């Protein structure tokens, strides 16, 4: 068996196929039979065997689900072990350790990330390794990773668990593909420092938590773990609805958490749940109007999770007794479409609908393509969504010359500047610059806060220049940073503090920034 010859034959045949062609699998199987290979090779192995001039074309042909990394990073979602929420259980909660599913709180255990977690016994190292391997098998690059920690109220877990979980995740990136976890869990500082020069850079870390478990002490711990983004389970902005659903937190908790997170330089996302028990179509419309216009809210990104009735949940009992009824399908589509028309240009609608399998949905929408249904409704009625995701350059190509725009708005007692690079109506990249409402971290004295810098388009590996069709690594980030510095100086600030992912710190050092706690800081002229 000549494996090298088999790969050459396979590559030459695949290069004749169009991108995403189903015939790729048939070619692989045929070559395996011809050369008596013991296993069908992964896409990553095929790419490794290709000549340099073949790799770019080959990657486009082999790439499966290209939207996964279209925003410029590979999202790696991991799940913490099952543990109860500190307040108890909400009315619509679909799972938890005491549920028959014995799943992480607020998950059924059948979601893709939950299945991966359970398969690996909730081991963080193994989960990250498996997801990276899966991405590579699908033909994606994994040079830049956003780690998303899911599974309930992470900030309520013991500090040691939080630290070891994150450290193992980063260790997995640092040692991929052939590494194994160290016998003794590494400390967070050492693995994060090592990641700055790793082949796989962690450019962002997201934690899910509750608004009432996002006080200063929780935020300080998250910053120490390298967290750059926090998703809050807001669900609604009506205290009566929250109380009825036994959320255990209030609108005031959300406002406080939103303010503290922003003034610490972190990015903030909201999870919202229309169609909760006790809510109505009108109150849900009001909810969306409020979060997009009221300066106490206005999240950086948003996930909309229409309420679902799942087996064994308390909401199922309400549904069976006729106390609760989901909205009609058409009503829900129109509600989400209406919400999309309200979204400002500085907010990203990240997701609509949960990953719960249709077989576990007793009542509620079973559509997995809810975003498409809402978008179709907008198109049919001549309306548009102006959110970040709908305008990303990778989804909305443009050949118009680019320019810079600055949008200023008040939020949580401070002033936000959404500085963007655009080409026509396509968004190339942006930065979020905040003049804070208060300073409670010593590193941030007299500093404006750059909470995010992001350039869109397909992921370009660290250290490689962009091709003509790619947008990363073409100095847009540097131009956005320069404009943020100018804006901060004009605002009377003598320093700029950047909320940087550990894998991006070397880039900011090259721009004159130095490490100060969890931030990269520069003295402004």
Predicted features, each with a name:
Residues 1-127, 131-182, 345:
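Flexible, acidic/Gly-rich N-terminal and inter-domain linker regions that tether
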Residues 80-83, 97, 151-153, 209-213, ...:
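Short, flexible loop/turn elements at secondary-structure junctions
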Residues 110-127, 147, 151-330, 334, ...:
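Conserved non-cysteine loop/helix-boundary elements of the Radical SAM core domain that shape
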Residues 222, 508, 513:
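Conserved active-site tyrosine of GNAT-family acetyltransferases
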Residues 253-255, 259-386, 462-479, 490, ...:
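A structural motif corresponding to the C-terminal lobe/cap of the Radical SAM core domain
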Residues 401-402, 408-458:
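A conserved beta-strand-loop-helix scaffold within acyl/acetyltransferase catalytic domains
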Residues 486-500:
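Conserved GNAT acetyl-CoA-binding A-motif
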């Amino acid at each position: 068996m000549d494996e090298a010859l088999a790969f050459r034959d396979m590559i030459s045949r695949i290069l004749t196929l169009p991108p995403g062609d189903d015939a790729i699998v048939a070619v692989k199987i045929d070559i395996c039979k011809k050369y008596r290979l013991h296993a069908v090779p992964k896409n990553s192995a095929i790419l490794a065997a290709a000549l340099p001039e073949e790799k770019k074309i080959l990657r486009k042909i082999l790439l499966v689900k290209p939207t996964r990394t279209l925003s410029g990073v590979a999202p790696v979602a991991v799940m913490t072990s099952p543990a109860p929420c500190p307040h108890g259980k909400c009315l619509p909660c679909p799972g938890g350790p005491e549920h028959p599913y014995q799943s992480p709180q607020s998950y059924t255990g059948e979601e893709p990330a939950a299945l991966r977690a359970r398969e690996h016994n909730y081991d963080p190292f193994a989960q990250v390794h498996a997801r990276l391997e899966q991405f590579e098998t699908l033909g994606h690059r994994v040079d830049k990773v956003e780690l998303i920690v899911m599974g309930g109220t992470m900030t309520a877990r013991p500090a040691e668990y939080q630290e070891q979980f994150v450290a193992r995740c980063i260790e997995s990136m640092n040692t991929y593909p052939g590494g194994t976890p160290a016998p003794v869990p590494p400390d967070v500082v050492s693995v994060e420092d090592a990641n700055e020069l790793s082949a796989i850079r962690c450019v962002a870390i997201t934690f899910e938590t509750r608004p009432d478990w996002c006080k200063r002490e929780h935020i300080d711990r998250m910053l120490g773990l390298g967290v750059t983004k926090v998703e809050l389970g807001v669900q609604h902005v009506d205290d009566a609805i929250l109380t009825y659903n036994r959320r255990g937190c209030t609108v005031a908790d959300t406002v406080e958490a939103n303010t503290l997170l922003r003034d610490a330089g972190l990015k903030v996302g909201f999870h919202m749940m229309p169609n909760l028990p006790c809510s109505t179509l009108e109150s849900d419309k009001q909810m969306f109007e409020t979060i997009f216009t009221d300066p106490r809210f206005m999240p950086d990104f948003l996930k909309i999770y229409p309420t679902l009735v799942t087996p064994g949940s308390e909401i199922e009992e309400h549904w069976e007794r006729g106390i609760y009824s989901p909205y009609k399908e058409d009503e829900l589509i129109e509600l989400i479409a209406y919400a999309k028309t309200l979204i400002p240009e500085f907010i990203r609608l990240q997701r609509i609908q949960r990953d719960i399998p249709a077989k576990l949905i007793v009542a509620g929408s079973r559509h997995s393509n809810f975003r498409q249904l809402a978008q179709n409704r907008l198109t049919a009625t001549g309306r548009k969504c102006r959110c970040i995701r709908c305008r990303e350059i990778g989804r909305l190509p443009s050949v118009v010359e680019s320019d810079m725009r600055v949008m200023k708005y008040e939020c949580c007692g401070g002033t936000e500047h959404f500085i963007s690079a655009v080409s026509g109506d396509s968004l190339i990249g942006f930065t979020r610059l905040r003049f804070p409402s208060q300073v409670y971290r010593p590193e941030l004295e007299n500093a404006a806060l750059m909470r995010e810098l992001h350039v869109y388009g397909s992921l370009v590996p660290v250290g490689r220049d962009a091709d003509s069709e790619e947008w990363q690594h073409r100095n847009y980030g540097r131009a956005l940073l320069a404009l943020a510095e100018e804006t901060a100086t004009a605002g009377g600030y003598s320093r700029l503090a950047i909320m940087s992912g550990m894998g991006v710190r070397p880039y900011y050092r090259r721009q004159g920034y130095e490490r100060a706690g969890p931030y990269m800081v520069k003295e402004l002229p």
